[in-house]
């Protein structure tokens, strides 16, 4: 177990957004955290990261994982596109939690920055201004930055929003590499589930509560069952109206 939610209730100022949240994420898993807009996905992520306070329940981490050691790539923000720093500076800033009260980055953090530039295949961009890059390039830079913060868990909030098909495909390839070769646990928040099911090995479906937690094959069976049930209920209503 790397992350666990038990009987979790979350929301804002006692207004419940999600309740009865129970799931466990294991080391090395590739998780699709799925739900419609407004289903509470981003609220759950912010609560896991400690940016929001939980109302009830527990969030437990493995001994070698903490909220500060989780890499996080938030939803696309237009304000970031004009960020004046270089690509190298943006990626290196992911090491800020590692330096503590030291005034400078050490050799290990510089080495880690270089390594993440290499992993994301953006070494040729390191001296470019972040604001000059395309959307897909900026996404890679921010992903490298998030990886500088973690060896264990990376959370990405709607990373495919605004990307064209070709760019999204390349991002999937990068994420597969991060998960399989680096062994990083991925939690991908999205409402685009179809393509993500081809890559993830666990699905968590939210809608005011945790509707499902299991592998993609089980989830497809769950969807089929829910569809047949809804069709059956629809026909029953139709019969009553006849």
Question: What does each of the following model-derived ranges do?
Answer:
Residues 129-133, 137:
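Conserved ABC ATPase signature
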Residues 154-157:
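Catalytic Walker B motif of ABC-type/P-loop ATPase nucleotide-binding domains
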Residues 57-70:
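Conserved ABC transporter NBD signature motif
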Residues 202-215:
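H-loop (His-switch) and adjacent beta-strand-loop-beta switch element
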Residues 165-167:
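Helix N-cap at the start of a conserved alpha-helix in ABC-type nucleotide-binding domains
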Residues 107-125:
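Conserved ABC ATPase "signature" region
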Residues 190-191:
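H-loop/switch region of ABC-family ATPase nucleotide-binding domains
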